[in-house]
Amino acid sequence: MLGRCFPPDTKEKQQLRMTKLCDPAESELSPFLITLILAVLLAEYLIGIIANGFIMAIHAAEWVQNKAVSTSGRILVFLSVSRIALQSLMMLEITISSTSLSFYSEDAVYYAFKISFIFLNFCSLWFAAWLSFFYFVKIANFSYPLFLKLRWRITGLIPWLLWLSVFISFSHSMFCINICTVYCNNSFPIHSSNSTKKTYLSEINVVGLAFFFNLGIVTPLIMFILTATLLILSLKRHTLHMGSNATGSNDPSMEAHMGAIKAISYFLILYIFNAVALFIYLSNMFDINSLWNNLCQIIMAAYPAGHSILPIQDNPGLRRAWKRLQLRLHLYPKEWTL
């Protein structure tokens, strides 16, 4: 998505205006594989939008009805909104770039997609990191004075941290516009013949990319890894303590702790894969139509969907609401026919 094609050694390349786009790069994938990738992406987008829409609707309804919402619910609302917007944007971008390349290549349209994509991805990374941080502070069993003071103040800090993340993400997305430029060379010689072929070359602003990598991706990634790992260790230690005190492996409390450990581990793996795929995709390491680039897109689309399905399964309130929704959807056609 970040690659713009510029003929080398032209003013367009330097000014980043009135871009003269190259023809689309030749795809190295078969039509069947391209169709399969598009189908997988579409399914992931729809699952992510439905799952995040459900989470957002439940907590937003609670917010409106009770004039208040839990801190974790507030974070989930922010996270769900960012993911719905991101999944919708990615689905819209694929549709427009596939059906109307000339319109998609216009500067205003291209940069609108580019800035929105980076902004929503960074928001999603930060919100998920704050969710992990909040659970760590509330659940982990540590007795350090600083940790206890943080636990007492975390509820009041979270709203400010969420809006600060929005500001950081927006500022950083504006800064990252000109990190990478991709242009084509139409006269690359083929030594085995007298013909030439088109190649796509990239120029990367290394300083900008380093800043982009550290602030936009690595900072929330490190925070998520540290808090999730410490929370897993705390839960594991507490579970071992409960086991040594006797109650047996079928104790509901112990099963709940083990379920929490598995869920957090699952979140951690998804988050790391998504962050790595996002960095590779944004830095244009591979050709835009290569298998690796498409694999990064699949991972990025799978993360919001997979990361949202598990809370619905593990959270009793969300699980009950989901079952009620399924029951209503099942009964509605029967009532309509009557």
From Swiss-Prot:
It is a multi-pass membrane protein. The keyword ATP-binding does not apply. Residues 1-30, 96-116, 178-205, 284-291 are extracellular. Coiled coil: none annotated. Its main location: membrane. Glycans are attached at N185, N194. The chain crosses the membrane at residues 31-51, 75-95, 117-137, 157-177, 206-226, 263-283, 292-312. GO terms for cellular component: membrane; plasma membrane. One of its GO terms (biological process) is detection of chemical stimulus involved in sensory perception of bitter taste. Residues 52-74, 138-156, 227-262, 313-338 are cytoplasmic. Keywords: G-protein coupled receptor, Glycoprotein, Membrane, Receptor, Sensory transduction, Taste, Transducer, Transmembrane, Transmembrane helix. Signal peptide: none annotated. GO terms for molecular function: bitter taste receptor activity; G protein-coupled receptor activity. Most taste cells may be activated by a limited number of bitter compounds; individual taste cells can discriminate among bitter stimuli. Belongs to the G-protein coupled receptor T2R family. PANTHER family: TASTE RECEPTOR TYPE 2, TASTE RECEPTOR TYPE 2 MEMBER 39. Receptor that may play a role in the perception of bitterness and is gustducin-linked. May play a role in sensing the chemical composition of the gastrointestinal content. The activity of this receptor may stimulate alpha gustducin, mediate PLC-beta-2 activation and lead to the gating of TRPM5. This is Taste receptor type 2 member 39. It comes from Pan troglodytes.
